[in-house]
Amino acid sequence: MDPLTHFDEKGGARMVDVSLKGDTRREAVARGRVLMHRDTFRRVRDGQIAKGDVLAVARLAGIMAAKRTSDLIPLCHPLSLTGVDLHFTLDELHSTVEIESRVKTTGKTGVEMEALTAVSVAALTIYDMCKAMDKNMVVSDIRLVEKTGGKSGHYIREE
């Protein structure tokens, strides 16, 4: 296992110095899900939630969150993202909204945290917009599924 890079020699937190690293194309994909009651799921699917189009708002929230990741996660570098996309899959059998984010940049450090943040905030937005009718929703399985670029190369999660 690689040493933890966010700590100095005395164990104090630090932001890693990436100034000597070269720019490379980087991409990360993350996924998560929101499980809900069947009636809630149908209302999300059919656009019948009082607060508005749940998936459209969640998509925008996820994109905005990816752009603000360094404001939320203390040791993340502020990045110039070149692309953020969120995709939703409606799983009617399990009353679940599956969320996938894809984040891209060309830079000195990866975009894994931005992809994970996008999924997390999109999921929380779905919860927020539907909580009046379903407080039993479950946000789960937020995970990195793929990353490319940088020193560690290409990673694909085995699912």
UniProtKB/Swiss-Prot annotation:
One of its GO terms (biological process) is Mo-molybdopterin cofactor biosynthetic process. Pfam families: MoaC (PF01967). SUPFAM superfamilies: Molybdenum cofactor biosynthesis protein C, MoaC (SSF55040). Signal peptide: none annotated. Pathway: Cofactor biosynthesis; molybdopterin biosynthesis. InterPro entries: MoaC (IPR023045), MoaC_bact/euk (IPR047594), MoaC_sf (IPR036522), MoCo_biosynth_MoaA/MoaC (IPR050105), Mopterin_CF_biosynth-C_dom (IPR002820). Substrate binds at residues 75-77, 113-114. The active site is at 128. GO terms for molecular function: cyclic pyranopterin monophosphate synthase activity. It comes from the Bacteria. Its EC number is 4.6.1.17. It catalyses: (8S)-3',8-cyclo-7,8-dihydroguanosine 5'-triphosphate = cyclic pyranopterin phosphate + diphosphate. Keywords: Lyase, Molybdenum cofactor biosynthesis. Homohexamer; trimer of dimers. Catalyzes the conversion of (8S)-3',8-cyclo-7,8-dihydroguanosine 5'-triphosphate to cyclic pyranopterin monophosphate (cPMP). Belongs to the MoaC family. This is Cyclic pyranopterin monophosphate synthase. It comes from Heliobacterium modesticaldum (strain ATCC 51547 / Ice1). The lineage of its organism: Bacteria, Bacillati, Bacillota, Clostridia, Eubacteriales. The gene is moaC.
